[in-house]
Structures are given as structure tokens and as C-alpha cells.
Amino acid sequence: IKFRKYGVMKFIGHLDMMRYFQKAMRRAEIDIAYSEGFSPHQIMSFAAPLGVGITSDGEYLDIEVHSTRSSSESVKALNDTMVEGVEIVSYRMLPEHAKTAMSIVAAADYKVFYKDKGNCPFTLDELKGKVKAFYEDAPEILVTKKTKKSEKVMDLKQLVYDFQVEEADGCPFFYLKVSTGSVD
């Protein structure tokens, strides 16, 4: 299932989105499979949790079903149960032993805009110069990652596949393609 998350729903966290989709599956009468055992739960997994405050046009959710309607009927049934801010874009059956969305998604595209688009502090050329000085000219961008047990120095530049400055409505914004997986 591919879905969009926008508007006020950007403030809903990942665990609440999971509970929301569990209820939406029941309301839409999707014949979803349940795990076995003492406390059965719907078999579903999100490709990558989206941070609070971030909108998306392409989030992915895998579910296991016993039977299904056509893709268009399933999209309509789910969208009829959705609140404003969540929209099902597509629904399709995968082969029996297909990899999960979580294991396939390796990168994510981000567009980072200034909060007040009408009051941009930099011109496009100024921002391009700052990005060149910070990102392109630097051989590495080191940060210290702290865990409960240790500290580890990481090079963030290895996790950024593309970093551009673009312009929309007269205001520059950042376009980034970054790794979604873990890097040791």
C-alpha cells in the first residue's frame, strides 16, 4: 500500500499511525491476516517510520491478507475510512515471497523549505554558495553518535547521495536524497 501523509496528520507519530491503520483495515473490511499465538495482531509493517512534523507523498505499508478485492476497490474502501491528511495512493498484490518494503527502501528524497516562504533570508545563489562551502568542498562531515554504551564518529556525507539547492515560488529550498538504512 502506498499512501500520502499531509496537513495536520504530520503531527501524528509512527505508533499512532500504526494503530490508525489497524482500525482503518477493520473499517474498510480488508481481509487482513493475524499473527498466531496468545495475543494475535494484524500482520503489517511500514517501510520506514516517518518523523513527526514531516509530510510525505510516498509512504509504504505491507500487509498480509487472506483474500482481496481489486486494487481500485481496496483503494476506494480504505480512502472512504481515512481522515483528511491520509490518502491511499495505490494498493497492489505482491508475489508470495516478495521482499518487504522495509528491506527494499534504501533512500528517501526530502525537500526542506523555509518555514516563512515569503521571507527567505538567502537568495538562490547565496544558498548555493553556502552549500558548496559546507557540503561539496568538505571531504567529510563528521558527527559523534552517542548511544547508551558508547560514542561513535560517523561521516554524514556517506549517507547523503544527493544535495541540491532549488527554487520554488521565488524561495530556495534544499533537495536531499539520503540513506534510510543503518550504516555501521
Language-model segments: what does each one mean?
Residues 19, 23, 48, 59-61, ...:
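N-terminal, well-ordered alpha-helical segments
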Residues 33-65:
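Short, charge-patterned binding micro-sites
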Residues 71-184:
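Internal, well-folded beta-alpha domain core
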